[in-house]
Swiss-Prot record:
Domain I is involved in oligomerization and binding regulators, domain II is flexibile and of varying length in different bacteria, domain III forms the AAA+ region, while domain IV binds dsDNA. Residues 96-110 have a biased composition (Pro residues). Residues 1-72 are annotated as: Domain I, interacts with DnaA modulators. GO terms for biological process: DNA replication initiation; regulation of DNA replication. Keywords: ATP-binding, Cytoplasm, DNA replication, DNA-binding, Lipid-binding, Nucleotide-binding. One of its GO terms (molecular function) is lipid binding. Residues 83-110 are annotated as: Disordered. Oligomerizes as a right-handed, spiral filament on DNA at oriC. Belongs to the DnaA family. HAMAP family: DnaA_bact (MF_00377). The lineage of its organism: Bacteria, Pseudomonadati, Pseudomonadota, Betaproteobacteria, Burkholderiales. It comes from Burkholderia mallei (strain NCTC 10229). This is Chromosomal replication initiator protein DnaA. Pfam families: Bac_DnaA (PF00308), Bac_DnaA_C (PF08299), DnaA_N (PF11638), Hda_lid (PF22688).
Length: 533
């Protein structure tokens, strides 16, 4: 059994990336082999890794086992029985955090769930002076008030989408799950993901990387490795369906692997707004603040939904300040550059700018092809590069659109019982391709760019060469090449009969400068989003 596992591990180490091998294969261990039943049991340190390895690697491990023993082997994945007694390899438990002060909890009436009352007028114990006794009584009263408030937390938390707190951990500003406890059994592991609201499927391993998102991915990995130290806050912005949500879930999932006791919460901005409203209605801001201020990692998606909501912004500002002061990590996403989000308080904008702001651009052609090929592979379908290239060339906006198109192609192929070819793809995507071709034209690009740079549309066709005209013209040529199916000669003809070499020079010049000039990159991003509607 051990000989097989050494053989299997060595092969998988060569087949996988170093990150995949260390994250998923190295923590596994063979625990039993039944020669009579031809079953091999492999232990995983926690439920998350067990489920992922079972879904992604069980087939390959079964094949290797069959080859090794020259017989069909049933590979079973089980939780390591010792997982609850130790932290996973490489995991670093989080240091305890200092208790957070209570935000003046309201008095709570007596009842079976309340802490015993403290008599401030009771005689001081022997040997204790009056001043010391008063201080002790005050501390006991504060502790009792916190315990009383915590007794109601379960009901309030259910309404506010907050995990319930025990009296002890509410007083300490901490949630009920502890470092290492998440690995004790599958129920605890499932609870860990339920509390954090993370999607365990969204990881760095299955995030397709290209020029459009490589900086964002690098920053995300750096933050996952050094939360609260590198880039705090990390602000990711870009259009719909470009992978912002995938990346922030990947950060959370990686941190849970490295530090299973981490207090993590993913939340969409709309849910945060809803929680603020409910906390206000129920006078439950104590619980709200205690929960959010005690996190180790807060992932907040689509913060543009805070626009115009002053009370939400105020509460988030206080949470942000508390988290950063405690060296907790904050990660934010938006569809817009921070300074261009309307209706957001200047204090928040300045906090967003204090960390690292990274744009995620629409995927380039090669990346779109890679996304389609990987998605098809995950669906168990063989997709030719010709078909992937055809789809990627015609659909340019975002990953969700590509995945939706692929699902449509697969369904069309299955329904008609035909092989996936370019002809079938054209039939399956007929309506979508028609809409795409109708939406963006060279004329529309010229008008949009002219309006953006405050020049006349006629300047696009003219022979004028001042920088304030030549530059927008080159940008329009670049966008025409990127966003339409026109050839270089056709684009040149639409720009006043220019030669195709002039268009090629403009396209190469803008493409090269885009990678070096952050301002130009931002302007192009805005124009692309405007043209795509």
């Amino acid at each position: 059994m051990n000989d097989f596992w050494q053989h299997c591990s060595a092969l998988l180490e060569r087949e996988l990336t170093p990150q995949q091998y260390v994250t998923w294969i190295k923590p596994l261990a063979p625990v039993a082999f039944d020669a009579a039943a031809n079953t091999l049991s492999i232990a995983a340190p926690n439920r998350f890794k067990l489920d992922w390895v079972k879904s992604q690697f069980s087939g390959r491990i079964s094949d290797l086992a069959r080859d090794f023993w020259n017989a069909p082997i049933e590979v079973q994945f089980v939780l390591d029985p010792k997982a609850g007694q130790r932290s996973p390899a490489g995991a670093t438990p989080l240091a305890p955090r200092a208790p957070l002060p209570s935000a003046n909890p309201a008095p709570v009436g007596p009842g079976p769930a309340c802490a015993p009352a403290v008599d401030a007028h009771a005689p001081a114990p022997a040997g204790m002076n009056a001043a010391t006794a008063a201080a002790v009584a005050a501390a006991q009263a504060a502790q009792a008030a916190q315990a009383n408030a915590a007794a109601l937390n379960a009901d309030e938390a259910a309404d506010l989408d907050l995990p319930s707190l025990t009296a002890h951990e509410a007083a300490a500003g901490r949630r009920t799950w502890r470092p290492g406890a998440a690995n004790a059994n599958s129920e605890a592991a499932d609870s860990m993901y339920e509390r954090s609201k993370l999607n365990p499927v969204l990881t760095f391993d299955n995030f397709v990387t290209g020029k459009a998102n490589q900086l964002a991915r690098a920053a995300a990995i750096q933050v996952a490795d050094n939360p609260g130290i590198s880039y705090n806050p990390l602000f990711l912005y870009g259009g719909v369906g470009l992978g912002k949500t995938h990346l922030i879930h990947a950060i959370g999932n990686q941190l849970l692997l490295d530090k299973p006791g981490a207090r993590i919460r993913y939340i969409h901005a709309e849910q945060y707004v809803s929680d603020v409203v409910k906390a206000y209605q129920r006078k439950a801001f104590d619980d709200f603040k205690r929960y959010y201020h005690s996190l180790d990692l807060l992932l907040i998606d689509d913060i543009q939904f805070f626009s115009g909501k002053s009370r939400t912004q105020e509460e988030f500002f206080y949470a942000f300040e508390a988290l950063v002061a405690n060296k907790a990590q904050v990660i934010i996403t938006s569809d817009t550059y921070p300074k261009e989000i309307s209706g957001i308080d200047d204090r928040l904008i300045s906090r967003f700018d204090s960390g690292l702001t990274v744009a995620i651009e629409p995927p380039e052609l090669e990346m779109r092809v890679a996304i389609l090929m990987r998605k098809a592979q995950s669906e168990g379908v063989s997709l030719s590069e010709d078909v992937a290239f055809f789809v990627a060339k015609h659909l340019r906006s975002n990953v969700r659109e590509l995945e939706g198109a692929l699902r449509k192609i697969l369904a069309y192929s299955k329904f008609h019982g035909r092989e996936i070819t370019i002809e079938l793809t054209k039939e399956a995507l007929k309506d979508l391709l028609t809409v795409q071709n109708r939406q963006i034209s060279v004329e529309n690009i010229q008008k949009t760019v002219a309006d953006f740079y405050n020049i006349k549309v006629a300047d696009m066709y003219s022979k004028k060469r001042p920088a304030n005209i030549a530059r927008p013209r080159q940008i329009a040529m670049y966008l025409a090449k990127e966003l339409t199916q026109k050839s270089l000669p056709e684009i040149g003809e639409l720009f006043g009969g220019r030669d195709h070499t002039t268009v090629l020079h403009a396209v190469r010049k803008i493409a090269d400068e885009r990678g070096k000039d952050a301002q130009l990159n931002h302007e192009l991003h805005v124009l692309e989003q405007t043209l795509k509607g």
